[in-house]
Amino acid sequence: MQYDEHKLVEYFADAPAGVGFSDLDLNNIPHHISCIMDGNGRWATSRGLARTEGHKAGILSLREIITACVRLGVDVLSAYAFSTENWNRPQHEVNVLMHLFAKTFIDELPLLKRENVRVVFLGDISALPMKTRDVFERGLAECADHTGMTLALAVNYGARAEITRAVRQIALDAAAGKIDPAAIDDDMVASHLYTAGLPDPELVIRTSGELRLSNYLLWQVAYSEFYVTDTYWPDFDRWGLVDAILAYQGRDRRFGGLSKTEEA
């Protein structure tokens, strides 16, 4: 996606000491950046606040990262908002999250419209409370004709469930004679995932220092570069994003082949 140079320079002006924004190669920005937004609860607990306050603070960080990615010309930003396992959290926390999802989508619609952001959901949103689901569906309709960056929000998402769902759909089509089992390949499986039509993430960012995938995009991250920061999600900002992209740009992406040095 093309970036607006004036808006880019303005948004990333006055970089803090130690942040090398001028070193960023704007011709090598990942097309798809994915964020595992972790640490909201611990951020709140460390400040003597209720865990739900961390989720509220995390929304502000997501807003900043959305804007930063638009400014950088990122094609797709995906974010892990609520997993299929998160239903096991205390009911009060789940209720607050569902309310926050609905309220945030309404509150952020002006931003999404102003920045021409298209929204898609990864996961089974039919299982969400009716009020939250209705807000999501209305928001999707209002953003449907947007042609800028795609924001893919993983809500009630689990990668194993996603892959199982895809396999089941393919099996049903094969049993009905709609497809030849011999024709089943990577592309066919990918076309049955929630991310169908989206490029795989080149860069996956996980906050809070945890070194695990947490059942997230297991198929799609086969060749992704990972960046882990100890920063909790509510403290992750545009400058943290710049650091992550700089780290990505310093990697030698081999896709199972030889490095550039080895090829030489």
Residue ranges and their predicted role:
Residues 1-264:
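Flexible, compositionally biased loop and terminal segments
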